[in-house]
Swiss-Prot record:
<dbReference type="Pfam" id="PF17759">
    <property type="entry name" value="tRNA_synthFbeta"/>
</dbReference>
<dbReference type="InterPro" id="IPR020825">
    <property type="entry name" value="Phe-tRNA_synthase-like_B3/B4"/>
</dbReference>
<dbReference type="InterPro" id="IPR045060">
    <property type="entry name" value="Phe-tRNA-ligase_IIc_bsu"/>
</dbReference>
<feature type="binding site">
    <location>
        <position position="457"/>
    </location>
    <ligand>
        <name>Mg(2+)</name>
    </ligand>
</feature>
<dbReference type="InterPro" id="IPR033714">
    <property type="entry name" value="tRNA_bind_bactPheRS"/>
</dbReference>
<feature type="binding site">
    <location>
        <position position="460"/>
    </location>
    <ligand>
        <name>Mg(2+)</name>
    </ligand>
</feature>
<feature type="binding site">
    <location>
        <position position="461"/>
    </location>
    <ligand>
        <name>Mg(2+)</name>
    </ligand>
</feature>
<keyword id="KW-0694">RNA-binding</keyword>
<keyword id="KW-0547">Nucleotide-binding</keyword>
<dbReference type="GO" id="GO:0000287">
    <property type="term" value="F:magnesium ion binding"/>
</dbReference>
<keyword id="KW-0030">Aminoacyl-tRNA synthetase</keyword>
<dbReference type="InterPro" id="IPR012340">
    <property type="entry name" value="NA-bd_OB-fold"/>
</dbReference>
<keyword id="KW-0479">Metal-binding</keyword>
<dbReference type="InterPro" id="IPR005147">
    <property type="entry name" value="tRNA_synthase_B5-dom"/>
</dbReference>
<dbReference type="InterPro" id="IPR002547">
    <property type="entry name" value="tRNA-bd_dom"/>
</dbReference>
<dbReference type="InterPro" id="IPR045864">
    <property type="entry name" value="aa-tRNA-synth_II/BPL/LPL"/>
</dbReference>
<dbReference type="InterPro" id="IPR009061">
    <property type="entry name" value="DNA-bd_dom_put_sf"/>
</dbReference>
Length: 781
């Protein structure tokens, strides 16, 4: 919204300069985006009249002009403008004047002394044709200072309004805001009813009453469409961003800027029969004022006569009924079109109009009569003519329901004491009707405020007018108490830090994934499909973290990163109801960073399993299990407290080939909820007595997992046994080909006494018996 500050100050003139006024508007929520001078600085330029323009004796393209500049004698000025002619009134810069980039001095031009310069718009820094002198109206007073006469000491104010403030898309609306903010008196232009002088009317019917709940029309005959638009009106239109055209059109545009009510003038002689407000019919087209012919859709509101659509309601008029210089009779239209009936239609047709911009946000349905009377009076004053009576069709207009505002809630939300009298005064200044009942205010918003509907809207208005910048800064005051820390859970940040300490880097990948990739990892998986995917390759929700981790691996390998260790903590999506959090990881390349002291080797299953055991702080129970994404001979299900907590293993060979990898990465995925649980640590004193170690070699079936044997031994172990670990797996000479030999190291220590040989032998025997009973294992000879 752009407007002239001088025009605004005709309506409300607070004791603030331009900068202070802009700051006050911005602080009240009406952001001033730009302040632009109406004209660049120049001085000593006056209105002049060319008395004569003779050809220069020594230059074909120059003229020697005698110019009346309001002084006793005419001034001689040499001019090269092609349109310099006697009788023209033009700007004249006298000697000593300073124009943008130039200072005027008395100078000889081809032997003729010139006492000033006749100016074009370009030389003054103004808009307009620059190929000749700037021609002023015939009524321009000779000798008058040009800046004062053209009101060039003005500022163009540009507001960046939010969509809810449609009431500020007019000078009256902005003036009302300034008055409420500053307390200055607001002088809203009053339009007295114009008495009809003729009885002519146009019949109006509204078929789409939901879209148009009020329509006013008026016939005005005998106008002079070629009448000159007054300079003050043309100036205000131009500074509001609207180019003056014909006087009748300028009048409707002026009312648009002043009152915020879009209007339209039809050439009455081009209308056939009455006016109907209806929805467009299939196949109808309309040639618009812009020259564009559009095909109308059935959800577009049109103004139609007997021949068909003549205007796109609330957006743009039609070419066939446009007002021209020869137009004598017009039909003025002012209406309230529902925002929902206009919104989006202009953009769909590639149009952007001031009318659509306002109707989409909501215009004041209570001021349509005032707009019609104002436009009629201006039209009669400028173009003459005889007005007819107003034809009106009114349906169900929007209602402004009362809103209850609790002063206690206002103070609590605002954080500042606002008195009832002040709140009532501020809301009344905005046009609200306010009634007080104890500590409650019952507020009825005005017809032009579509954005006031609930209590919070009124709180915003009260605080806005009080001034956001006046609310004192208060640091929050609250009791400080220590919160108990749940030591039975590991926080996500602690889990991430542990993974970083284990030499893994965190990654965050898309939750949206390619369905082909998910099904490659698990052909039987049930995918959760998105209703509106951002891309076809991101159309399902991930059911595992592995897909994103593998893509991250490939991304790094393509950038010559040969050693990759990454993890992600995030949700997977089995269904709408089941969305567990998982910890997934991947290791690829060398087990350790390259260095001279340790021979290089690739990371394997047991490296990653060891990382997870360090993460848990205890040995993991890795049992048999098959996952379609993992190598069947290099994978395991991970069990925690009797529950399957996840998977670990090398990527399946078919997927290594499918993902074009040189080797198989080792993957793991764990339920983060199981990971987060942990037992409270218990203190155990250090034993002062020596440890005893025994190495046992058990022969058992080759297909039996080492974990099964360890589980049996640990379950049978007496309290004196501190550790049971596998340190060798032998298959070969001396062991049947269907069997294997597992070497177990047993560490024993008592906290009360030194263990005797008998104690040790008894403990070992319990382990041997358990191995035989549970695993059919025997001691190797």
């Amino acid at each position: 919204m752009q407007f002239s500050e001088a025009w605004l100050r005709k309506l409300v003139n607070p004791a603030l300069d331009t900068t202070e006024l802009a700051h006050a508007l911005t602080m009240a929520g009406l952001e001033v985006e730009a302040l632009t001078a109406a004209a660049p600085p120049f001085n000593d330029v006056v209105v002049a009249e060319i008395l004569s323009a003779q050809k220069h004796p020594d230059a074909d393209r120059l003229r020697v002009c005698q110019v009346d500049i309001g002084e006793a004698a005419p001034a001689t000025i040499v001019c090269g403008a092609p349109n310099a002619a006697a009788g023209l009134k033009v700007p004249c810069a006298r000697p000593g004047a300073k124009l943008p980039g130039i200072e005027i001095k008395v100078a000889k031009v081809r032997g003729v002394e010139s006492f000033g310069m006749l100016c074009s718009t370009k030389e003054l820094g103004l808009e307009g044709a620059a190929d000749g002198l700037m021609v002023l109206p015939d009524d321009a007073p000779v000798g008058e200072d040009l800046r004062g006469w053209l009101n060039l000491d003005d500022t163009l104010v540009t507001l960046k309004l939010t969509p809810n403030r449609a009431d500020c898309l007019s000078l009256v609306g902005i003036a009302r805001e300034v008055g409420a903010i500053t307390g200055a008196e607001v002088r809203i232009p009053q339009a007295s009813p114009v008495a009809p002088r003729i009885a002519d009317t146009v019949e109006v019917t509204v078929a789409a009453s939901d879209a148009c709940s009020r329509y006013l029309g008026r016939v005005v005959r005998g106008i002079d469409a070629q009448a000159t638009t007054p300079r003050w009106m043309a100036e205000r239109l131009e500074r509001g961003g609207i180019r003056p055209l014909l006087a009748p059109i300028d009048v409707t545009n002026y009312v648009l800027l002043e009152l915020g009510q879009p209007m339209h003038a039809f050439a009455l002689s081009r209308l056939s029969g009455g006016i109907e407000v209806r929805l467009a019919r299939a196949g109808e087209t309309l040639a618009l004022l812009s020259g564009q012919t559009v095909e109308l859709s059935p959800d577009m509101l049109v103004i139609a006569d007997a021949s068909g659509p003549v205007a796109l309601a609330g957006i743009m008029g039609g070419q066939a009924t446009s007002v021209e210089r020869a137009t004598v009779d017009v039909f003025l239209e002012a209406a309230f079109f529902a925002p929902a009936a206009i919104a989006g239609r202009a953009r769909r047709l590639g149009l952007s109009t001031d009318s659509a911009h306002r109707f989409e946000r909501g215009v004041d349905f209570g001021a349509i009569h005032a707009a019609m009377e104002r436009a009629t009076q201006l039209l009669l004053d400028i173009c003459g003519g005889q007005p007819g009576p107003i034809s009106e069709v009114t349906g169900s207009l929007p209602r402004r329901e009362p809103i209850e505002l609790r002063l206690s809630r206002l103070r609590r939300v605002a954080g500042v004491e606002l008195g009832a009298d002040q709140v009532i005064r501020d809301l009344a200044a905005l046009g609200c009707v306010v009634e007080q009942a104890d500590e409650r205010l019952v507020v009825t918003p005005p017809s032009f405020r579509f954005d006031l509907a609930i209590e919070e809207d009124l709180i915003e208005e009260a605080v806005r007018l009080f001034g956001y910048d006046r609310i004192p800064a208060r640091p929050p005051a609250a009791p400080s108490r220590m919160l108990a820390q749940d030591e039975t859970r590991i926080a996500d940040d602690a889990l991430r830090q542990k993974m970083v300490d284990l030499d893994y880097q965190e990654v965050i990948t898309y939750s949206f994934v390619d369905p082909a990739g998910e099904q490659a990892l698990d052909p039987d998986v049930r995918l959760l499909t998105l209703a509106n995917p951002i891309a076809s390759q991101l159309s399902v929700m991930r059911t595992t973290l592995w897909g994103g981790l593998i893509e991250t691996l490939r991304h790094n390998l393509n950038r010559q990163q040969e050693r990759v260790r990454i993890f992600e903590l995030g949700r997977v999506y089995a269904s709408l109801a089941e969305q567990p959090r998982k910890l997934g990881g991947l290791a690829y390349g060398e087990a350790l960073p390259e260095q001279w002291g340790v021979p290089g080797r690739r990371v394997d299953f047991f490296d990653v399993k060891g990382d997870l055991e360090r993460l848990f702080g205890q040995p993991l129970d890795a049992g048999r299990g098959e996952h379609p994404a993992l190598h069947p001979g290099q994978s395991a299900a991970l069990w925690v407290d009797g529950h399957r907590g996840g998977w670990i293993g090398a990527l399946h060979p078919r997927l290594v080939q499918a993902f074009d990898l040189a080797a198989a990465p080792v993957l793991f995925e764990l339920d983060s909820e199981i990971l987060a649980r942990r037992a409270l640590p218990r203190h155990a004193g250090l034993s002062r007595f020596p440890q005893v170690r025994r190495d046992l070699a058990f022969v058992l079936d080759a297909g039996l997992a080492a974990g099964d044997l360890l589980a049996a031994l640990r379950e049978a172990a007496p309290a004196s046994i501190r550790a049971i670990e596998v340190f060798d797996d032998y298959r070969g000479k001396g062991v049947d080909q269907n069997q294997k030999s597992l070497a177990i190291r047993v560490v024993m220590q008592d906290t009360e006494r030194t263990l005797t040989d008998r104690d040790v032998d008894e403990a070992v025997q319990k382990l041997v018996d358990a191995a035989a009973r549970r695993c059919s294992a025997t001691l190797r000879a």
